[in-house]
């Protein structure tokens, strides 16, 4: 009984893996209360923000569903990664992916060390809002899917593959490093392809020298044979020795040719080698990189052209600004001279008009006096010449003359008022026009000053 108890003990470190084994081996499934149902989602292409290395939870509705899982809550992400293809099917799962964890309002990438620590219960309530598991299939610049954990697993497998008994090398570490470096610098591909035949030739030369040294040792060993054998079989040994030397030389020449041919084959068939499944993608990646370089060169040329055009336009703008400033100063000087000329004329005419106005007022006063005297004389004459019949007073000539003089006086006064009103109106119109022109000039000056200040701030 003690032995059975010891056998049934489960180690603490491998508890999640043991639970998976028990689930797969035991026909009786555990109760549903011990399992957790998780909905698995994929992040679609183009939605992941590679600059910020995160994505908002508001875009979760656009994620692609891959199915759901019923697993133990104590299972770690590392163990789930190994068995995820069995739960959901290999077709529904990407070859290489990353787990995502909801923290706050964003999704964060789970690193390799955290995969062995995080358990699936942290992705279900009450630890999470929704029982959902998010996967991110990551694409490199050559179009291959990769993730930090799977790259490390590949390196471990390649290290183990080198030491296999069959002697077949699946994928050495240098190849993975070569692929990583080739994405950064495409010129490495040409250099490595050129160096491969040289290395193979050196190896072939080394093998040939080793075979020659072995032949020399055999010859020395054969020369140390007993004298009886040398005497008895001298002729036969000489012929055999010469034949062996010729055969060895032929073998070394053939081996050299074969090594060179194998090196050339490796040089030619390097992209189609079965141990490098990503080699066909390298050509497409190189073409993409070359296209990117050509596009970059085009963009750089366009940038240079735009800079030259900008400089040319800036020079033209500066010249135009200078010409505008000169024209503005010239127009300002013209206006100033015109203003001064009109001001002088106005003062001179004002001096003249003052004396003329005095003369005019005197003449008006004299005219009024003459008009009053004339009316008094006509009225006195009318009284003297008044007939006895009052009905004929309106028909007299004197009365008509009085009316004519009164009407003429009224007409003269109206003319004077009209002339004064005309003068006032003309002055007001001129003043208004002058005010409008001054306002326009002030506006243009203000706009120019604003432009100059803006340009000064920009510089």
UniProtKB/Swiss-Prot annotation:
**KW Magnesium (keyword) present:** no
Q: What is its main location?
A: cytoplasm
Note the subunit structure. Interacts with IFT20.
Upper taxonomic lineage: Eukaryota, Metazoa, Chordata, Craniata, Vertebrata
Give the gene name: SPATA1
Q: Where in the cell is it found?
A: Cytoplasmic vesicle, Secretory vesicle, Acrosome
- Swiss-Prot/TrEMBL keywords: Coiled coil, Cytoplasmic vesicle
Query: Which stretches does UniProt call biased (Basic and acidic residues)?
Result: 193-205
From the UniProt entry, list the residue stretches annotated as the region Disordered. Answer: 193-213
InterPro entries linked to this entry: SPAT1 (IPR039062), SPATA1_C (IPR031478)
Top-level taxon: Eukaryota
- Listed GO cellular component terms? acrosomal vesicle
Descriptive protein name: Spermatogenesis-associated protein 1
Q: List the coiled-coil residues.
A: 287-374, 400-453
Q: Give the source species.
A: Homo sapiens (Human)
């Amino acid at each position: 009984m003690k032995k059975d108890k010891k056998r049934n003990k489960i180690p603490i470190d491998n508890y999640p893996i043991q639970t998976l084994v028990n689930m797969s081996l035991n026909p009786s499934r555990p109760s549903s209360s011990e399992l957790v149902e998780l909905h698995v989602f994929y992040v679609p292409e183009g939605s992941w923000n590679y600059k910020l290395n995160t994505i908002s939870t508001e875009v979760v509705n656009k994620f692609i569903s891959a199915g759901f899982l019923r697993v133990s809550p104590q299972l770690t992400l590392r163990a789930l990664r190994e068995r995820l293809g069995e739960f959901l099917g290999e077709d529904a799962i990407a070859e290489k992916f990353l787990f995502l964890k909801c923290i706050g309002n964003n999704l964060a990438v789970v690193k390799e060390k955290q995969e062995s620590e995080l358990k699936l219960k942290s992705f279900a309530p009450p630890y999470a809002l929704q029982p959902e598991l998010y996967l991110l299939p990551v694409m490199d610049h050559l179009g291959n899917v990769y993730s930090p954990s799977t790259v490390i697993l590949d390196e471990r497998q390649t290290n183990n593959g080198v030491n296999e008994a069959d002697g077949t090398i699946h994928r050495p570490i240098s190849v993975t490093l070569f692929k990583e470096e080739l994405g950064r610098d495409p010129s490495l591909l040409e250099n490595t392809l050129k160096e491969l035949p040289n290395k193979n030739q050196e190896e072939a030369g080394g093998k040939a020298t080793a075979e020659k040294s072995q032949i020399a040792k055999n010859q020395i060993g054969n020369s140390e044979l007993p004298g009886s054998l040398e005497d008895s079989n001298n002729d036969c040994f000489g012929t055999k020795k010469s034949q062996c030397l010729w055969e060895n030389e032929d073998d070394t020449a053939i081996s050299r040719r074969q090594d060179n041919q194998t090196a050339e084959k490796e040089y030619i068939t390097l992209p189609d080698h079965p141990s490098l499944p990503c080699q066909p993608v390298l050509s497409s990646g190189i073409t993409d990189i070359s296209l990117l370089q050509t596009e970059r060169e085009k963009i750089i040329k366009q940038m240079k052209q735009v800079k030259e055009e900008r400089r040319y336009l800036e020079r033209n703008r500066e010249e135009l600004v200078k010409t505008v400033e000169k024209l503005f100063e010239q127009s300002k000087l013209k206006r100033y001279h015109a203003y001064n000329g009109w001001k002088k004329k106005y003062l001179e005419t004002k001096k003249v008009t003052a004396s003329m106005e005095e003369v005019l007022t005197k003449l008006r006063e004299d005219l009024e006096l003459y008009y009053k005297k004339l009316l008094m004389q006509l009225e006195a004459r009318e009284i003297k010449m008044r007939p006895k019949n009052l009905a004929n007073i309106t028909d007299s000539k004197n009365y008509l003359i009085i009316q004519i003089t009164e009407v003429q006086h009224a007409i003269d006064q109206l003319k004077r008022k009209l002339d004064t009103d005309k003068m006032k109106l003309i002055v007001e119109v001129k003043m208004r026009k002058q005010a409008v022109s001054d306002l326009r000039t002030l506006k243009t000056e203000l706009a120019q000053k604003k432009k100059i200040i803006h340009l000064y701030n920009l510089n």
